[in-house]
A protein has these predicted regions:
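Blade-level signature of beta-propeller repeat domains, shared across WD40, Kelch, NHL, RCC1
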Residues: 306-334
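A short helix->beta-strand "capping" segment at the edge of beta-propeller domains
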Residues: 3-28, 63
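WD40/WD-repeat beta-propeller blade-loop signature
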Residues: 19, 29, 43, 66, ...
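WD40/WD-repeat beta-propeller blade N-cap
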Residues: 23-30, 71-78, 115-122, 163-172, ...
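A structural motif specific to WD40 beta-propellers
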Residues: 18-20, 65-68, 110-112, 158-159, ...
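WD40-repeat beta-propellers
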Residues: 56-60, 99-104, 147-151, 197-201, ...
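Conserved strand-to-loop turn within each blade of WD40 beta-propeller repeats
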Residues: 50-53, 93-96, 140-143, 191-194, ...
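Loop/turn segments within WD40 beta-propeller blades
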Residues: 33-44, 81-87, 126-134, 175-185, ...
Length: 334
């Protein structure tokens, strides 16, 4: 079953809105975005952005200004940001082969720890909370096709995931750690350079399933663990939708043709109603998650959109090479 996007907007696709507001001031391409509840801002929501210049900006969505700037990556691009379960700690991953742990409590902005990385690629890390104080971290490993799993904050190596001897998937490009409610066993979804997506059983260090989703490197993926369904984008002109059955087998459910090639990032909204893609064609595209029906094409940016992020309340942020971050309120959560 294939989904096909028509060239013209379908009658049900209303004229796209303008951004609710725009954040300016990074003075550099925006490569990473992450929303967090504001420990610093008396409960107000904050947006974190990582830029090509190596800086992390912390934005107040109330004042629409940066309230702090973190400089921990020696001028090298920041490609991933993630707050930890307790809220006031932040992980930032840069192309300086370093993952920094920041303490943001009470207005602090100090690096309290760091992890040396083995790979300089653009593969963002992933975490899985193991209670309030511990979490599992997946990052690209030393070998070009390897993934390293660490227990944090102890930095203890759990294992290295190496592809099967006969598989040649190339480099991991994107990672997603998760676990089902019914099982404590952590799983990892990895998108690879050859266009495949693999499901790893981390405890067993083995690939449960691998599917060919794309003919180009997988640039972004997201997974809906409640529906056991995921979506991925690549350098080509299609999104792939795939599912996971009870036997841990991945299956491609359909492909959705895009108007233009190249997806940098894809995110499913927390309520699992819609998803957004960041496009090389300067566009953010919004789809209905269950049907993959196109809902909106957001044409605000003047250069590649590198990243998208959803807040818990449904607000959407997009970061671009044009140095701007656009904030959108779409299809309010019911």
């Amino acid at each position: 079953m294939g989904y096909t996007e028509v060239a013209a907007a379908p009658p049900s696709m209303a004229a796209p809105p303008d951004p609710q507001f725009v954040l300016r001031g990074t003075q550099s391409a925006v490569h990473a975005l992450h929303f967090c509840g504001g420990a610093q801002e008396q409960g107000h929501q904050l947006l974190l952005s990582g830029s090509l210049s190596g800086l992390v900006h912390i934005w107040s969505l109330q004042t629409r200004r940066a309230i702090a700037t973190l400089d921990g990556h020696g001028g090298q691009c920041v490609i991933w940001l993630q707050t930890l379960p307790q809220g006031h700690q932040l992980l930032s991953q840069g192309r300086d082969l370093k993952l920094c742990l920041w303490d943001l409590a009470e207005g602090r902005n100090a690096v309290v720890d760091s992890v040396g990385l083995e790979s300089v690629g653009f593969c963002r890390g992933s975490i899985l909370a193991r209670g309030q104080q511990r979490w599992m971290l997946a990052v690209p490993g030393r070998g070009s096709d390897e993934i390293q799993i660490l227990e944090m904050p102890s930095k203890t190596s759990v294992c290295t995931l190496k592809p099967e001897a006969d598989a040649k998937p190339g480099m991991p490009m994107c990672l997603e750690l998760w676990q089902t409610d019914s099982s404590p066993r952590p799983c990892l979804l990895a998108g690879y350079e050859d266009g495949s997506v693999a499901l790893w059983d981390v405890s067993e260090r083995k690939v449960c399933s691998r599917i060919a989703c794309h003919t180009e490197p997988v640039m972004g993926l997201d997974f809906d663990s409640q529906k056991a369904r995921g979506v991925s984008g690549s350098a080509e002109k299609a999104l792939a939708v795939w599912s996971l059955d009870e036997q841990q087998a991945l299956q491609v459910r359909g492909t959705h043709e895009l108007t233009n090639a190249g997806i940098s990032d894809v995110k499913i909204r927390p309520d699992r109603k819609i998803l957004a893609t960041a496009g090389w064609d300067h566009r953010v595209r919004v789809f209905h998650w269950r049907t993959m029906k196109p809902l909106a094409v957001l044409a605000f940016h003047s250069a590649v959109v590198h990243c998208v992020a959803f807040a818990a309340d449904g607000l959407l942020a997009a970061g671009s090479k044009d140095h701007r971050i656009s904030i959108w309120s779409l299809y309010p959560r019911s």
